[in-house]
């Protein structure tokens, strides 16, 4: 599976698990990347950071 396909599948799983629109997930990921706020204190973002770091 390509990296783009993996990212798409992951965004889909996150949107279903947390009942968030997939475009909202992408927008929030973009906001997180541009922000200095520590989102790792929120469970949703801990999961995102774990996946991005290869821990999940």
Please provide the spans of the model-predicted regions:
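Short, charge-rich amphipathic interface segments used for partner binding and complex assembly
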Residues: 24-56
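N-terminal acidic leader/helix
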Residues: 1-22
């Amino acid at each position: 599976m390509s990296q783009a396909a993996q990212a798409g599948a992951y965004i889909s799983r996150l949107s279903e698990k947390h009942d968030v629109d997939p475009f909202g997930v992408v927008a929030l990921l973009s906001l997180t990347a541009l922000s200095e706020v520590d989102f790792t204190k929120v469970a949703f973002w801990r999961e995102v950071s774990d996946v991005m770091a290869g821990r999940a």
